[in-house]
Amino acid sequence: MTDLIDATDRRILHELCANARIPVTELARKVGLSKTPVAARIRAMEEMGLITGYRAMLSPIRLGLIHVTYVEVRLNDTRQKALEQFNAAVREIPEVEECYMIAGGFDYLLKVRSHDIAEYRKIMGEKLSALPHVAATSSYVAMEAVVEQNSPSL
């Protein structure tokens, strides 16, 4: 990425990550350019796939989704077809905020958000345990979010 964008692009991205609704004129003032080149740079970064979209950031706490659990998942089959089946099925569970395939002592790490432990237990029993090829799971309840970043460091 360092060859694709310069310091001005990084400043633009930094400002957009902080406030995607910033008017282009204000953004231009902050980065020291006029409106037209800033708009062109944004369009170019969208076209090259650096900016993939703009979305509202919701407060899970305000929505009552205060319970976060990380779940280790071990599969009984890790051939490609089994992985594809698991991937497709886990994408259908809205409570799963993040899912990563892991190299290590287990196969996947899920971040699951729910209202409380009772709801999590239901999600585990009815949805996660029923995913294709699941052999075992281990749950870790988060007690406090110490760092939560919504964008990569530039």
Swiss-Prot record:
Lineage: Bacteria, Pseudomonadati, Pseudomonadota, Alphaproteobacteria, Rhodobacterales
Alphabetized CDD domains for the sequence: HTH_ARSR (cd00090)
Pfam family, one: AsnC_trans_reg
InterPro entries attached to this UniProt entry: ArsR-like_HTH, AsnC-type_HTH_dom, Dimeric_a/b-barrel, Tscrpt_reg_AsnC-like, Tscrpt_reg_AsnC/Lrp_C, Tscrpt_reg_HTH_AsnC-type_CS, WH-like_DNA-bd_sf, WH_DNA-bd_sf
PANTHER family: LEUCINE-RESPONSIVE REGULATORY PROTEIN (PTHR30154:SF0)
Binding region for DNA: 24-43
Sequence ranges assigned to domain HTH asnC-type in this UniProt record: 5-66
Signal peptide: none
Protein keywords: Activator, DNA-binding, Transcription, Transcription regulation
Gene Ontology cellular component annotations, sorted alphabetically: cytosol
Name used for this protein in its record: Proline dehydrogenase transcriptional activator
A single BP term in Gene Ontology: response to amino acid
Domain of life, source organism: Bacteria
